A protein has these predicted regions:
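Flexible "arm" and connector segments at domain edges
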Residues: 1-71, 75-106
Length: 106
């Protein structure tokens, strides 16, 4: 993929991969800047979903976007933010799934 090698398929490996990638190219942005970028990307995803499935027609000047690309952008920034804040996303996801499972069982 890049000089960092192939993208791992496990979440912890993805976090390490993105950490190596960002360090090769510079540094992490501040957490607040990362959050602002995340909000921007979520907005772009929302815009594309609204064009595709909502009531807002796409204007002639609006190029079709890619839901896949927008989700990839969001995931990349989530990985960056988690790394910067020293959060194990696999552990966070496991806790969230357990929490939702308990809610569904109630």
């Amino acid at each position: 993929m890049t000089e960092t090698g192939e993208l791992p398929s496990d979440l912890a490996g993805m976090q390490r991969y993105v950490d190596a990638w960002i360090r090769e190219r510079g540094r992490y942005w501040t957490p607040l800047s990362q959050f602002a970028r995340l909000a921007e990307e979520v907005g772009e995803l929302g815009r594309e979903l609204n064009f595709r499935f909502g009531d807002k027609p796409r204007a002639a000047k609006d190029e079709p976007g890619s839901v896949t690309d927008e989700l990839g952008d969001i995931f990349f920034i989530v990985l960056l933010l988690a790394n910067d804040l020293k959060i194990d996303l696999a552990g966070a996801l496991a806790a969230t799934v357990q929490k939702y499972g308990q809610r569904a069982g109630s």
